[in-house]
Amino acid sequence: MAKAKLGIRPIIDGRWGGVRESLEEKTMNMALAAKKLIEENVFYSDGTPFECIISPCTIGGAAEAAKCADFFSTQNVCATLSVTPCWCYGSETMDLDPLTVKAVWGFNGTERPGAVYLAAVLAAHAQRGLPAFSIYGKDVQDVTDNSIPDDVAEKILRFARCAAAVGQLRGKSYVGIGAVAMGIAGSFCDADFWQEYLGIRAEWVDMVEVTRRVELGIYDHEEYERALKWVKANCPEGFDKNPENIRHTPEQKEKEWEFVVKMTLICRDIMLGNDKLNDVRPVGAEAEHSGPKDGWHEEALGRNAILGGFQGQRQWTDFMPNGDFTEAMLNTTFDWNGKKEPLTFATENDGLNGLSMLLGKLVTGRASLFADVRTYWSPDAVERVCGMRPEGVAKDGFIHLINSGAAALDATGVCKDKDGNAVMKEWWNVTDEDIDAMLKATDWCPADLGYFRGGGYSSHFKTQAVMPMTMIRINIIKGLGPVLQIAEGYTATLPDEIHNKLDMRTDPTWPTTWFAPRLTGKGAFKDVYSVMANWGANHGAISYGHIGKDLITLASMLRIPVAMHNVADEDIYRPHAWSAFGTKDLESADYRACAAYGPLYK
């Protein structure tokens, strides 16, 4: 499938005889400037620039609008940016494709009324039920000025970044391996939601498929041997918390390591496919099974996934090694092959949390952390247990983010930028030094056999730096539909005297992140307790950076209302028509607008 692209539509006054001719160069300069800005700053999740194409002609009326639409229809255009320095003919030139996300940039100048066209065409968009984002600079520019002001660039880039996410979602699959884990509602795969709001196909694969591929050798054997050698050299075994009388033997543990490495290759191949499976031929006992003898061609295709999940508990983990290693490595920005794009893979098959992780990945290019939103620690409770109060970003209390070790190793917080600051990097900027640091900050503890009878290994680390982070969650509410929750904040580092005591009170073999949301003093962000109390599920996705404003824009494109956030009103950017649903209470207006327009693909 061709990559989704952004189409730029240069709109012009259609009057020949001097008017149109005088505007051609300026109009195309706007289009070229927008293309350059976007392609230098917005990237697909594979790290390549988000491709922009420009209409083969300027658009002065319906005939040229149709010519542009015909061209875009061959290019997998997921979003359009219409640009103009002048008055043009609103509904005659607008983008009428109901499946594209739309924005219009009207040049703020005095020679020609770009603002008047912008207002006119946005009125047409609102009347036709085709919401569009408005882009208009705060300061007047001279007509000869082809630069893009900072405020305009910010809106163009946010629109493009979020439109790229919409385009990358459409036409892909969610592959849920297994079913609902332990009654967790997010594990229930609502195919209508995935299809209508995201354009994603829901796929189901029984966990027995993993067993089949292990037993029949349906994986790349050369990669397996290389991966196992790398794991033995780079993934040290952590402490075993199990009583000695029930601990697995060294021989059992060795078999578990072999199994979880195979399982990692297999889950990846189920989702993405692997051409090498075409050449994997059954040998020995494997050849006695019915099935292909010249390679595993169906399995090589994969399932066109953009994300997946693994049920694990309980039917699998009661007798097989758990999925912690697999989940952690797929979600991380590297493996035995070096740096790689993280493959979003949800613990306990919680697809809604997987989707939340994926949205964070698509707008940042970085790994996302999967965790239980486990415990709220107030300063008073910390003092009672530890004899001292937390300080710094944790002074008002914090939330313990922890889950059996499916967390991306990027969350160790040991990667550094050029200035020495701790970061989670875009995967394509991860260095060998970063990989080495993340591996050294992590060990792999044998699973708690009381909970995971089949064994397995959990990544074990603590987030070692204060970093800006955003916690994200999509929930589905009966009678309402999907809603998005956002909490910007910081990871916290605690003195060992506090960290050790608090960490030992839960499962100390799991990775720990202490998270302090940024408080506003009102609503769900009145205090840390209120953030925890209003969170809509047991899981959260945590992404690097304060990306709430991007997520709010993206949610409006998908028609998903935002139920909770701590982003300033002045940073909220939604389609222009949202203001028709109210300007005083933006949260309520968002609900009304999303309800009025409905799912993007319904």
Q: Language-model segments: what does each one mean?
A:
Residues 1-602:
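An N-terminal assembly and electron-transfer interface module characteristic of large anaerobic redox
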